[in-house]
Structures are given as structure tokens and as C-alpha cells.
């Protein structure tokens, strides 16, 4: 147990700093865990699978007895064990990706716990010496020369084939894509075209090149819209000092309607006929409210606007 306590104490000093527990507190915690049967062997302390049961048991004991000494010590030890394990896994993964060996991901054992600075320097020196001794024979080895062999007979030296220096046959395409190898030959049959000269363009009356897409005739579209669309009519507007005011399109009709409303009221047959004639024209709601302002008085117009809205 002394060796385990020493390793755990060293790890706590490395990762916990000034808050690391003493060896006496660590020993008391380990004895309590063995007494309660949470640790069959001290090596089980390094297994992550036993951390949760230990935490649960110590938490329950602290709640029942009201003593949290072992729980506090276990919290510091657990933090040190997790930090050491993460550092070991990260180091092994880095070695694996860099091709330096390692790459295992497993629960850390006693050898995975952080060692003191002196031991780390000694181990680092031994590893460097071993790596240098392993790489030395490979560096001093003479490089092998690879001889070139004949393409037909396979003889490296003394080939008498007439086609020994002939290049391999050209690559034949699969036929999925068109080849441009014969385009230059077809152009060269009619004469060499100097570099930078403009290629002759196909005339409109000649065949040989597919015509391009037809352009949109916007002028024709505008004429068709102007002939088939609704007529565009602008309402006359008079600009006054207080702002724009509506001008009736039919002054005589508006004047007659105003006179009929003034003489017989809104319910008179003449007024109703005049209103129907006025409403038969394509007027917008804003255009309807303007003649009512002219025909009606201030009070009837206010009542009519409330009913209209």
C-alpha cells in the first residue's frame, strides 16, 4: 500500500497543487474503501469503472454520518487520476498520429501516473538514446539502386531488343468522353493557322455550326402588352396650397348629383340614379370618397365616412 500511496500523493501534488491531500489522509481513505469492500485490490483504484461506485458509497456515508473527510480526499484523488489518464491518452494518440508508436487507449495503470520531474528527465534521456541507437543502422545503410529493365524482355543489362528504347503504347480512352486529338489534325489539313490569328467564323447562311439560342424580343412584348392590356388612365389632380385635391371627371354629372341631393335628399330617385351612374365607372375607394366630400355637407360626410370605413 505504501507504493500506491506514494504514487497517488505524487499525482495529487502534480495536478492539485496546494490543495493536495497528505499521505495520511490518502492511506485512511484507502483503508476505509478496503474495509467497506469497494476495493478488492489496490490496482482497482486505477480503473475508471470503479470510480462511480466509490463516489456513490462515500457520498452516502458522508450524508449518514455527517463526516466528509474521506469524500473530500477522494474528490482530490479522483481529479488527479482523471487528469493523469487524459494526459496519457492524449500523449498516446499524438504518438499514434505522428507515427511514433503507441496509440493505445486504455485505463491507466501505476505506470501512467505522472512521475516526478527527475524521473521524467531520466526516462526521456533513455528513450532518446534508444531511439538514436535504433535509427543509426538505418541512416548508415547504403541506398539501394533500382535498375531499369527492358519493356519487352525484362532484362536489366545487355538487352538486344530493337524496341528496347521505344516508349510504351499510347493510352486508349474509354470512349465515354469525346477526344480532341483529331481536332488539330483536321484544322492542319487546310493550312497552318498562325498563332494569335482569329479563326474564321461561320456565316449565317452556311451550315456546319448549330445556331445559338434566340434572343428575347422585348420590343414585341411591349407592343403586345400595350395592345392587349387595360388602358392606362390618369386621374386629373389640382395642386392647391393645402395639398392635392380631386377634380371630378364629369363635372356636369357631379353638379347634377349635388343639386339632386340638395333638393330631394339622398333617398330621392334622381339622387339614387346619379349615384348609380357615378359608381358604374371604374373608381377606386379613394376616388369615391372625394365626390362624396363635394356632394355632402360636413356633418353628413362625417357620418358617411364612418359608415364607409
Swiss-Prot record:
Comp. bias regions, Basic and acidic residues: 127-137
Example GO biological process: viral budding via host ESCRT complex
Residue window of motif PPXY motif: 168-171
Domain of life (superkingdom): Viruses
Keywords carried by this UniProt record: Capsid protein, Host-virus interaction, Viral budding, Viral budding via the host ESCRT complexes, Viral matrix protein, Viral release from host cell, Virion
Residue numbers marked as site, Cleavage: 151-152, 162-163, 173-174, 235-236
Cellular-component GO terms for this entry: viral capsid
Domain notes: Late-budding domains (L domains) are short sequence motifs essential for viral particle budding. They recruit proteins of the host ESCRT machinery (Endosomal Sorting Complex Required for Transport) or ESCRT-associated proteins. Gag-p19 contains one L domain: a PPXY motif which potentially interacts with the WW domain 3 of NEDD4 E3 ubiquitin ligase (Potential).
Protein name, UniProt field: Gag polyprotein
Organism: Fujinami sarcoma virus
Name of the encoding gene: gag
